[in-house]
């Protein structure tokens, strides 16, 4: 996965041209897999062209959302965290791409599309008068002892919350809500939509909201 600004095109990553035209595009913060060329190819195919840039977000952290995705992981979401600065990525979307992204993110079901305060996100193409957007989880943040859990894979300064790896948070959910062997349970979550949705309902009932 690239660790620098890049251009998504032909289903992969290329260097981002220094004169890339950001005007007219909507900057959308990517806090999980939407930063990866592999995920973007799954969502947009090989014909899409999109800038993906590295950025810093202040007063938020990237934490686990209180639901299980159909591919068997706990998705990420943003949650307020005073004095924290977290590394995020930005997808620069045209009108058609934004509509497609809304569909893949289940806007109105799992997420709402929200504007961040102007200047909260800094990085390539972003200025103090430009507001980036993000997908706010309708399910709330997965909580342990009443506090959200950050993603250990995401770099942050002055982090306020405990941080878990993806496998650790899945094993915690299994310990609290699952039965049988971990792998058997996880396989069932991927293959059984009603069972996964029932678990998501239990997680969201105990979630915390910003």
Mark where each language-model region is.
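Glycine-aromatic micro-motifs
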Residues: 1-210
């Amino acid at each position: 996965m690239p660790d620098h600004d890049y251009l998504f095109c032909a289903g992969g990553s290329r260097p981002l041209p220094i004169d890339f035209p950001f005007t007219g595009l909507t900057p959308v913060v990517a806090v999980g897999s939407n930063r990866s060329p592999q995920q973007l190819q799954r969502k947009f195919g090989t014909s899409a062209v999109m800038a993906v840039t590295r950025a810093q977000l202040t007063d938020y952290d990237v934490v686990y959302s209180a639901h299980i995705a159909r591919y068997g992981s706990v998705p990420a979401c943003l949650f307020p965290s005073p004095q924290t600065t977290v590394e995020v990525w930005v997808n620069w979307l045209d009108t058609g791409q934004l509509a497609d992204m809304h569909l893949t993110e289940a806007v109105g079901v799992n997420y709402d599309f929200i504007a961040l305060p102007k200047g909260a996100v800094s990085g390539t193409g972003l200025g103090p008068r430009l507001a980036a957007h993000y997908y706010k989880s309708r399910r709330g943040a997965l909580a342990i002892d009443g506090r959200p859990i950050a993603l250990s894979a995401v770099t942050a300064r002055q982090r306020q919350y405990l941080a878990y790896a993806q496998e650790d948070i899945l094993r915690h959910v299994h310990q609290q809500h699952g039965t049988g062997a971990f792998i058997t349970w996880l396989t069932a979550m991927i293959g059984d939509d009603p069972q996964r949705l029932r678990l998501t309902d239990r997680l969201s009932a105990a979630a915390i909201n910003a």
